[in-house]
Each structure stands twice: as C-alpha cells, then as structure tokens.
C-alpha cells in the first residue's frame, strides 16, 4: 500500500479514513450551519503522491474555501498523514460513484458519553484555527502568551506555572491560548492525555454522572489526565456541588504533578460565590492578565488575519477597523470577516468608504465616542487632581503620572494622532506623548494593580 495515499473505504467499513476524519473535524470546529453552507457539498476525488484533490460544486464555493479555510484543511490532512503537502480544490461535474461526501450526525460535546470521553479522540475538541503561530503578541497579552507557551513546551510533567490562571474580558484571547496549548501538546507529545472543556460542560458531565450513577468513572476520567484545562471557571460560582468536585479534582491533579490551566473573566480574588479554599488554590501558580488590546495590537491582529486569508485590504480601511473596533479581538475579527464577505459576494474591492458603510450599523450599536477631554476628566477625578493639571507644565509625580496615564488612554481609546493628543495636554510635543505612552506600557508589565486600574477606567469610558 502506498502510504502517501489517502484510502477512502466504504462507509460501512469500521476503519476510520482520513477524509471522514477531516470532515468530522471541520464539522466540530465550525458547527453545523457553517459546515452545511461550505463543506457539506465538497467531495474527495483522489490523492496522488503528496497532493489531495477535492471538488467544490461551484466556483464561488471553491474560491471562498480557498481564501478562508485552505490552511485549516491542509493542517487537518497533515495531522492524519504528514506526507500531504498540498490540497487542491477544483470544480467539475462528477458521476455519483466518484463522489465521497459525508453525512454527519448532529452532536454537541454535551451529548458525548463517558466511553467516548475516555477515548483518545480528545484532539477533536481543539480548534485548529487557534495556534501559537497565529496568536498575535503585544504588550497586553505577552505574559499570558509566554506562560501558555511554557506550559505547552514543558519537558517535565508540569511547568513552573501550575496552575496557570488566565483572566481578562471576553474575546481577548484566553480561549485561543488554551486551544493552542492543547493543539501543541497533541502534535508534539501525543501520548499525553489532555482535556479542555468549559466549566459549564464540566458541570454538565458531573450532573450527568450523578444521575447515571457513574461518579467513579467521572472522577477517574478527569483525575487521570496529564493536562486539564477548564475555561470560564466563573460559571461554577454559586454551584456548591460542582465546586466540591472541582476542588477535589484540582487537589488530586496538583498532588500528582499534573498540569492545570484555568481561564476566567476576573482575577481569583474577585470571584464571588466561590469557596475561599478554591480561590486560594487558583492563585497558587501564575496569574496572568490578558487585558484590553492596544491600537498597535489590533493593527497586528488585522494584518495577520488578512495575510492568512490572502485578501487585499487598503491601509486606510485597516486603520479604520483598528481605531473603531476596540471592544475585543472577537468583534474585531468579526468586523473584518463581514467586510471581506461583502466584497466576495458583491465582487467589489474593499475601500475605506465601503468599509464604513458595511459596518455602519455595527458601529452605531457600539457607538460611544470617547474624547481626550472625557479621558482627562475621568483620570483627574480618579487621582484627585485638578483638570487644569492635565495641561500644566508641573512635573510632580502625583500629577505627572496621572497625566501620562491619560495620554496612554487617549492613544488607546481615540483615533487622535500623537500631535493632536499633545495639543490637548498643554501643547506638548509629540515626543513627550510617546515617552508617556512608553512609560505606562513599561509599568503595565510589572504593576498588576495599575493594570487592573487602567482596565477598569477603560471599561467605564467605553460603556
């Protein structure tokens, strides 16, 4: 048998073939609606040497899959057969006998039974789109990134960061990092047992185990893994039985030198309705904040995404997106996807003007125009200084530091240039503004209290 070829067996065959694995993974990753829209009518034709050939029903579907999903599809094929180097997608009429499509059952993670969860098919719960390679690193997330990478690459059973606790707002990259850890381990150390799931699903599985009298099986499954990652731990707040089970699972894994990674929307100390003994343990290892994006980070994320999708977006449109979509990465990428989809559907090139028109409703619903004056008032009030101190030449630390913070927030939350920001602070030179921003960014790397303070001010200003 030629090992470079993918062999499609009859669907009644018990063996699992590569194409069915790939389609199942696409279904798991993207969900039923998107799978049915783009992948369900794609057929496997053949493999020759290092190339797989697929067939799409229309040129439009072929081009759309090529632009958005070709990298993911290739990575999935390579996971099952690393000899594959390229995936080609063609369009042509096919006799029914040559078509290999897959009817997939509608199944959510919550429907998976304990026997399946005990199997080695844990890989399918990791989203191949979320890797370390496509995670854009900047000042707001570099500590979390470095810690997550250290966990994934650790040559020992556990890293020095155990447990690793990632916290921050919605859509800032916590889940991306957790998937990246799992994906990296399964690629580079496939013998290690890794489970990732949300706290909600952890609770669901626990309740199901209680109902079916399978508690011992549940305990064995979760307490025998090498790496356990629980997303959105705040979900178990106020749920006493689930907290009790999580507490004992946590203790068992830590005592046995197994790695834990936890994510949350707030720091351990800010969790309400959760036992103090759990709060304490969540802070045992490294607590890393994934805080709000900077303009530069948003710009980097957009440029990386555009390169992955192989589309042309003019610089002024990219700048517009980075300046206006400030809430989180998820919304930023969603806005970019909307602009690109509109361009593909209408066959119109992307311009600043049509970007503004396409996103008008989104921006209007989110609209909260923040001015430099708003920021100055908020910061002056927070630090109990006069508003006039923002534009004064006084250099006392109690005045200079709040002024630097206000300059930093003005750069993050407004589209103003450094020159324009300087004018609002007593006609200061743009180099003074640059120095202030750099100073605050340096402080944010080591001063957790300041980081939380600035995050809070940003949320208040944005809402």
UniProtKB/Swiss-Prot annotation:
Residues annotated as binding ATP: 171, 173-175
Keywords for this protein: ATP-binding, Cytoplasm, DNA replication, DNA-binding, Lipid-binding, Nucleotide-binding
Region described as Domain III, AAA+ region: spans on this chain: 125-343
Entry-linked NCBIfam families: DnaA
One Pfam family this sequence matches: Bac_DnaA
Protein name: Chromosomal replication initiator protein DnaA
Lineage of producing organism: Bacteria, Pseudomonadati, Pseudomonadota, Alphaproteobacteria, Rickettsiales
Residues covered by region (Domain IV, binds dsDNA): 344-463
Regions that span the bilayer: none
CDD domains attached to this UniProt entry: AAA (cd00009), Bac_DnaA_C (cd06571)
Gene field: dnaA
Subcellular location, record wording: Cytoplasm
UniProt GO molecular function: ATP binding; ATP hydrolysis activity; DNA replication origin binding; lipid binding
């Amino acid at each position: 048998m030629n090992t470079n070829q993918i062999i499609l067996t009859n669907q009644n065959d018990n063996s699992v073939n590569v194409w069915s694995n790939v389609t199942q993974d696409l279904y798991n990753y993207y969900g039923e609606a998107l799978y049915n829209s783009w992948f369900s009518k794609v057929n496997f034709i053949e493999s020759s040497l290092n190339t797989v050939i697929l067939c799409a029903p229309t040129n439009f579907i072929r081009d759309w899959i090529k632009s958005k999903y070709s990298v993911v599809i290739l990575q999935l094929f390579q996971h099952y057969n690393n000899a594959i180097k390229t995936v080609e997608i063609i369009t042509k009429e096919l006799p029914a006998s040559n078509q290999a499509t897959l009817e997939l059952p509608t199944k959510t993670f919550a429907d998976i039974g304990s026997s399946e969860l005990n199997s080695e098919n844990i890989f399918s719960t990791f989203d191949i789109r979320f890797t370390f390679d496509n995670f854009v690193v900047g000042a707001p997330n570099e500590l979390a990134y470095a810690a997550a990478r250290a966990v994934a690459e650790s040559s020992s059973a556990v890293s020095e960061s155990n447990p690793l606790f990632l916290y921050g707002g919605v859509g800032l990259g916590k889940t991306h990092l957790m998937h990246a850890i799992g994906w990296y381990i399964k690629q580079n150390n496939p013998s290690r047992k890794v489970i990732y799931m949300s706290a909600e699903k952890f609770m669901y599985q626990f309740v199901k185990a209680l109902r079916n009298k399978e508690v011992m099986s549940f305990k064995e499954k979760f307490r025998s893994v090498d790496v356990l990652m629980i997303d959105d731990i705040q979900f178990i707040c106020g749920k006493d039985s689930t907290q009790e089970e999580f507490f004992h699972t946590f203790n068992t894994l830590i005592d046995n030198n197994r790695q834990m990674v936890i994510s949350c929307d707030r720091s351990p100390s800010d969790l309400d309705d959760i036992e103090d003994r759990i709060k304490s343990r969540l802070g045992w290892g490294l607590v890393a904040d994934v805080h709000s994006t900077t303009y530069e980070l948003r710009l980097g994320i957009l440029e990386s995404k555009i390169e992955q999708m192989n589309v042309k977006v003019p610089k002024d449109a990219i700048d517009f997106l980075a300046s206006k979509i400030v809430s989180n990465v998820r919304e930023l990428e969603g806005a970019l996807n909307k602009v690109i989809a509109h361009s593909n559907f209408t066959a119109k090139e992307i311009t600043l003007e049509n970007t503004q028109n396409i996103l008008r409703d989104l921006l209007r619903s989110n609209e909260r125009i923040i001015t430099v004056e708003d920021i100055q008032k908020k910061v002056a009030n927070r630090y109990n200084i006069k508003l006039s101190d923002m534009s004064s030449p006084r250099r006392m630390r109690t005045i200079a530091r709040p002024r630097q913070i206000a300059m930093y927030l003005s750069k993050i939350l407004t589209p103003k240039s450094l020159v324009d920001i300087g004018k609002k602070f007593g006609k200061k030179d743009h180099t003074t503004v640059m120095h202030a921003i750099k100073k605050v960014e340096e402080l944010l790397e080591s001063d957790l209290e300041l980081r939380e303070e600035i995050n809070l001010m940003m949320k208040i200003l944005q809402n």
